[in-house]
């Protein structure tokens, strides 16, 4: 039993020496020295229970704070993607609405153009008929609103003979 106990004590002393070397390396670092020379560092050096409590608190709070920051980052990314998706949907709906309005205007413009063409052809035919009638009435010597005194053309002669 004594040999096992001696072996345990030797390993503990060796581990303690290694820990002391690590502590000296850490304490010799310039930033650690500056912190330990500050009033807060001196207070923590004089109150080990507060130091241990603060160390445990910081260690344990790292996980929830990390999860919270991950949640914030995930939410920000999700919001950005949602804004892009919503913006895409709004632009798509607006584009479809614009396309429908422009198609309706195109159909309406075709209808208006057709009505204007029919009106032009009908009006032109009526005016040509009225002009031809007045020419025939004016050449026969009848009193009418317009009395034309000119020589008759072959078209008028053929019209009169029929």
UniProtKB/Swiss-Prot annotation:
It holds the Pfam family Promethin. Its main location: endoplasmic reticulum. Residues 64-65, 109 are lumenal. GO terms for biological process: lipid droplet formation. Keywords: Endoplasmic reticulum, Lipid droplet, Membrane, Transmembrane, Transmembrane helix. The chain crosses the membrane at residues 43-63, 66-86, 88-108, 110-130. It is a multi-pass membrane protein. Plays an important role in the formation of lipid droplets (LD) which are storage organelles at the center of lipid and energy homeostasis. This is Lipid droplet assembly factor 1-A. It comes from Xenopus laevis. The gene is ldaf1-a.
């Amino acid at each position: 039993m004594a040999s096992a106990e001696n072996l345990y004590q030797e390993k503990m002393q060796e581990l303690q020496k290694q820990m002391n070397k690590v502590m000296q390396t850490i304490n010799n670092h310039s930033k650690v020295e500056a912190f330990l020379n500050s009033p807060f560092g001196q207070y923590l050096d004089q109150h080990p229970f507060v130091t241990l409590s603060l160390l445990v608190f910081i260690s344990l709070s790292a996980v929830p704070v990390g999860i919270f920051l991950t949640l914030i980052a995930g939410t920000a990314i999700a919001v950005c993607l949602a804004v892009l998706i919503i913006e895409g949907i709004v632009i798509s709906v607006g584009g479809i609405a614009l396309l429908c309005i422009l198609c309706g205007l195109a159909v309406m413009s075709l209808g208006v153009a057709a009505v204007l063409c029919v009106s032009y052809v009908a009006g032109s035919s009526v005016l040509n008929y009225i002009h031809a009638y007045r020419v025939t009435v004016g050449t026969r010597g009848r009193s009418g609103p317009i009395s034309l005194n000119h020589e008759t053309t072959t078209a008028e002669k053929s019209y009169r003979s029929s």
